[in-house]
Amino acid sequence: MKIDFNELQEVANPQFKGGEGDTMFRTFNDGQNKIMRGRLDPGCSIGYHSHETNSEIIYILSGEALCRYDEAEERLTPGQCHYCPCGHAHALINASATNPLLFFAIVPER
């Protein structure tokens, strides 16, 4: 099944999960999986939150990310992936002062 993110409406999520600025998402959700292409402009972030009933996979398409994962910090660049398993917590921050962070995320729903 093809999903064309260019055909999906981009929606602003202000202070998503308690983060800074707007998180922009183009989302496909079939009730079983949430599949998203996201954008964080400079100065924007997704706040620290836990995944108690699901997990999340984030693949960096372009830009630089700082990911807070439990007690650690991880730097991510294009081609790298972050995995937050069920029962863990994370945050995603655009680490660039000049370029947007583009990413692809999958959240399997239980």
Show where each model-derived region lies.
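A short, N-terminal "cap"/entry segment at the start of jelly-roll beta-barrel domains
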Residues: M1-Q32, G47
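Well-ordered beta-strand scaffold positions
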Residues: N33, E64, A72-E74
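Conserved short histidine dyad/triad with adjacent acidic residue
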Residues: M36-H51
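A generic "binding-loop/recognition-motif" signal
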Residues: P42, T53, A72, H88-A89, ...
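Histidine-centered metal-chelating micro-motifs
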Residues: S45-G47, L66, H82, G87-L92
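Glycine- and acidic-residue-biased ligand/ion/polar-headgroup-sensing regions
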Residues: T53-S55, Y59-A65
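Short acidic-glycine-tyrosine-enriched beta hairpin
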Residues: A72-C86
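Ligand-binding loop in jelly-roll beta-barrel domains
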Residues: C86-R110
